[in-house]
Design a protein with these regions (language model features):
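Short, small-residue-biased leader/transition segments that mark boundaries at the very start
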Residues: 1-9
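Conserved, mostly hydrophobic/aromatic
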Residues: 5, 41, 65, 126
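Hydrophobic faces of well-ordered beta-strands that scaffold small-molecule active sites
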Residues: 8, 36-40, 59-62, 109-113, ...
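Active-site-adjacent beta->alpha loops and helix N-cap segments on the catalytic face
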Residues: 10-22, 90-94, 142-145
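Catalytic cores of alpha/beta
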Residues: 15, 44-55, 115-131
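Generic long, charged, amphipathic alpha-helical segments
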Residues: 23-26, 30-37, 71-115
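C-terminal helical cap(s) of enzyme catalytic domains, especially alpha/beta-barrels
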Residues: 71-82, 127, 141-165
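Extended, intrinsically disordered, low-complexity segments
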Residues: 86-106, 148-173
Length: 173
């Protein structure tokens, strides 16, 4: 997205509508060179994605906060931190739902957080779900790019040969 300015909003639908309107009044209108994205970090952002689609061009999933809020646990609290896991079915269903709803109207979806670089199976889940981009820590970029390329190559080979892993888990919303 070189040369494209973006503005990320972590808010409710009504607030999003107001902010986009105020931005337009100030000369910041959505277009080819200015994109408005929503930080999808709270469950309501996912649940109401169909309504947010009217006001945004894309979503950036904040996987750390989204996981914490979907699972109702604090990853920094030793008493419950063992529950915190981006690979949890509820988190994956939320992520896939957002990708599907966003893509149904031509919106872009990115994810930021450690999970794609820490858990290869989560990286694979994201790719199979259609994620548009992943943002990871600088020290894991090379590893994650290589991992993603290997996963994409395997998916293509599986499609060509009719072999490979079959998804059995229900990820539908």
């Amino acid at each position: 997205m070189t040369g494209v300015q973006t503005c990320a909003l972590p808010i409710y639908v009504e607030e999003c509508e107001k902010v986009v309107k105020i931005m337009a009044e100030c000369g910041l209108e959505r277009g080819k060179d200015f994109k408005v994205w929503l930080m999808a970090e709270i469950p309501s952002n996912i649940i109401l994605a169909d309504q947010f689609n009217k006001y945004v061009d894309g979503y950036s999933i904040g996987s750390n906060d989204l996981t914490m809020l979907v699972l109702g646990c604090d990853r920094d609290n030793d008493t419950v931190s063992h529950i915190y896991d981006e690979r949890n079915l509820a988190v994956r269903r939320a992520v896939r739902h957002l990708i599907e709803v966003a893509h149904s109207e031509g919106k872009t979806v990115s994810i930021c957080g450690q999970a794609p670089s820490v858990y290869p199976e989560f990286c694979e889940f994201l790719i199979k779900s259609g994620i548009d981009s992943m943002s990871v820590n600088p020290d894991t970029v090379k590893f994650t790019k290589k991992l993603a390329a290997q996963i994409e190559q395997r998916i293509m080979m599986d499609a060509l040969t009719g072999k490979g892993r079959q998804e059995v888990e229900d990820l539908n919303w």
